[in-house]
Amino acid sequence: MSFVVIIPARFSSTRLPGKPLLDINGKPMIVHVLERARESGAERIIVATDHEDVARAVEAAGGEVCITRADHQSGTERLAEVVEKCGFSDDTVIVNVQGDEPMIPAVIIRQVAENLAQRQVGMATLAAPIHSAEEAFNPNAVKVVLDAEGYALYFSRATIPWDRDRFAKSLETVGDTCLRHLGIYGYRAGFIRRYVSWQPSPLEQIEMLEQLRVLWYGEKIHVAVAKAVPGTGVDTADDLERVRAEMR
């Protein structure tokens, strides 16, 4: 099947300035992400960035770049600018791969595209089972609850679903009911155009989760369990050192 990968790569980062260009074993991080995307079989891969230095690094690795504005409030807004500049038709399948995921398995990039293509829905994503209490109660690990057909009911930084009987006895174990949302999305290009026309929703502003805008406006998000779990993403200096060691 045919799909396009867009990799948002914002240069500024509060905790890690110039994050896309941070060296991981001899290559900028964004180049590692580009290589994972190439392994997925995508028809076209575009790095969306607001900085010329990132553009030069990607082009030196043979990649395609779209320079975007620096004032976007979310990765989806950056994608929308690329969709318009490239003139993608409304039915084009777009996969959003985060620019700070150098260890993302190529198989799940393709998986989210295939899941979207098989359904009459505007957006798809992935999740993975949570097995540790530390992760279940970590607000940085976003949880998702699904309906019987695999569509998202809600995303939250809180521990959902709350296992009342289990947690009343102990918070040391979590059972097998929690799913962690993985930050990879598939969309049809027309859906991205609709998304950015909607006003931000109260729920997304409370949780700081942009996917909640989709549910607020009554649209569906399909969620599949990932065929492989991504390695460490890079949000902090400690993450960077961990990834360097794991990829060595």
UniProtKB/Swiss-Prot annotation:
Asked if Methyltransferase is a keyword of the record, the answer is no
Reaction catalysed? Answer: 3-deoxy-alpha-D-manno-oct-2-ulosonate + CTP = CMP-3-deoxy-beta-D-manno-octulosonate + diphosphate
Keywords, alphabetical = Cytoplasm, Lipopolysaccharide biosynthesis, Nucleotidyltransferase, Transferase
Named from the GO MF annotations, one term is:
3-deoxy-manno-octulosonate cytidylyltransferase activity
Which pathway is recorded for this entry? Answer: Nucleotide-sugar biosynthesis; CMP-3-deoxy-D-manno-octulosonate biosynthesis; CMP-3-deoxy-D-manno-octulosonate from 3-deoxy-D-manno-octulosonate and CTP: step 1/1; Bacterial outer membrane biogenesis; lipopolysaccharide biosynthesis
Look up the record and report any one GO term of the cellular component aspect: cytosol
Q: What class of enzyme is it?
A: transferase
Q: Which InterPro entries match?
A: Cytidylyl_trans, KdsB, Nucleotide-diphossugar_trans
Give its localization: Cytoplasm
- Alphabetically, which GO biological process terms does the record hold? CMP-keto-3-deoxy-D-manno-octulosonic acid biosynthetic process; lipopolysaccharide biosynthetic process
Q: What is its EC number?
A: 2.7.7.38
Q: Does the keyword Transferase apply?
A: yes
Tell me which NCBIfam families the record gives.
kdsB, PRK05450.1-3, PRK05450.1-5, PRK13368.1
Entry function: Activates KDO (a required 8-carbon sugar) for incorporation into bacterial lipopolysaccharide in Gram-negative bacteria.
Family to which this protein belongs: Belongs to the KdsB family.
Q: What's the protein called, per UniProt?
A: 3-deoxy-manno-octulosonate cytidylyltransferase
Please report the organism this UniProt entry assigns to the protein. Salmonella arizonae (strain ATCC BAA-731 / CDC346-86 / RSK2980)
